[in-house]
Amino acid sequence: MKRMNKTKFAKAASAAFTGHRFYNFSQKELIKERLTKAILEAYKHGISNFISGFAIGIDLMAAQIVQSLKSSCPGRTLTAAIPFRGQADRFSANDKMVYENLIASADEVLILSERYYTRCFLDRDEFMVENASLLIAFYDGREKGGTYYTFKKANYLGIPVVNVY
């Protein structure tokens, strides 16, 4: 993977998101409330750029929240860290529409690879953690999958984690 070292944002002012693709739909409003609170708290403490991997589930939800706070959080930006071109090709019609609207309104879109490869999601997660000073997570404690990997990587690098699970 070709690493992108030059970005428009500063690591010290950036937070990344990680979370499960699937969650209990009956808890959607509670999850949104917790994510919103974590985003506002981060913003209050100097985080102005939010990096999302734009996967189905928590990533898209968090990106939507960041965009909804545009008027109440001056200077906040949304960065899309896309693991490979065509990420949304297999999304449902609704998720694809949400994805495309968010991509169109994102402040920066980084396509990390032109095509899918086995580690592309993990490499995207590493990119986000390595370019953030805070990780906002929706992590249930299971020791498998991309959310676990990202959570573990942030801890290894000494990056603070706010888990809204």
Report the location of each language-model feature:
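Acidic/glycine-enriched connector segments
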Residues: 2-165
